[in-house]
Design a protein with these regions (language model features):
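Flexible nucleotide-binding loop
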Residues: 96
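Extreme N-terminal starter segment of soluble prokaryotic enzymes
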Residues: 2-5
Length: 108
């Protein structure tokens, strides 16, 4: 496929927030947070998430259509540890390999 995969930055905050809210609304039981909680958060919260996490976005013709989020622990004995805290692909592109591409890019 012709996806572009890259790390999301502060300039992507509106698209990131929209996709995150879509994910929370579509798959309510799959995430630790809720649509209602995240909907009430200011945009600065999402900017901070982009800055403190590695969040890769998958773009299709310039539209953010998928993402994967990773948090690396910061303690001196824990820097080698991290966790994937979320992944979402827009339903129209599910099953097309974007999730695998995001996972592969993150693991490299």
């Amino acid at each position: 496929m012709g996806w572009q995969i890259r790390k999301l930055v502060a300039a992507d905050v509106a698209a990131f927030r929209d996709l995150r809210l879509e994910a929370l609304q579509t798959y309510r039981d799959a995430f630790g947070s809720t649509y209602e909680t995240e909907m009430s958060r200011p945009l600065s919260y999402f900017v901070e998430r982009l800055q403190k996490n590695v969040i890769l976005g998958g773009f299709d013709q310039g539209e953010l259509v998928g993402m994967i989020g990773f948090y690396q622990q910061s303690g001196p004995k824990d820097r080698h540890k991290g966790a994937i805290w979320g992944m979402y692909i827009k339903s129209r592109l599910q099953g097309g390999g974007l999730a695998s591409a995001l996972w592969t890019r993150l693991s490299n």
